[in-house]
Amino acid sequence: KSPLTGETLESLTARLAERGEPAFRAKQILEWLYKKRVTSWDGMTNLSKPLRAWLDETFDFLPATLVVNQQSEDVTDKLLLELRDGSLIETVIIRAPQEGVGVDHSRKTICISTQVGCAMGCVFCASGLAGLKRNLTAGEIVAQLIHVCRREDARTPRARQELASFDNIVVMGMGEPLANYDALLRALTILNADWGLGFGARRITLSTSGLVP
């Protein structure tokens, strides 16, 4: 099954149209996923049961599972996520505590991965020690931010305001981002779109070893 997190409004509208669903259904579904942040198909309460059953048969709700969350003394969190093929990737929450507001209300930067492993072989980086296994799909890239929102919503529920639960994204986790250009571009489109997380492009930083796609 393809991940729901890899669908754009246009592609999901087309998939639903094949089933005879009206165009507005796609926006409803994506609103449940990114704005209201439900954790299952059953949470999409304005959809019919037959439609929810079809969605469950057709799409993978979230193509990554949280294995462990490691928190360091400097309140940095590292999420270890398992993908459907058993591959493991890391996503890091970097907090910048601000005086007078406490850790839970501090600014948060999320470091996301774009590949399983890496082929670049930079001597200072552990990601490439085992070489490149494969590229992440757009859905797997976006899923990292969904897991972050789920964790951070429990601390400061920005989901009630339909806001992302972080302040900045840095694309400098596992992998060379520009070696997975097409999937990354699709993922960033989903993150930036008003029907997605609505996250501002000026708050996204991409780090590359110098590869030109």
Question: Where are the language model's segments positioned?
Answer:
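Flexible, acidic/Gly-rich N-terminal and inter-domain linker regions that tether
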Residues: 1-108
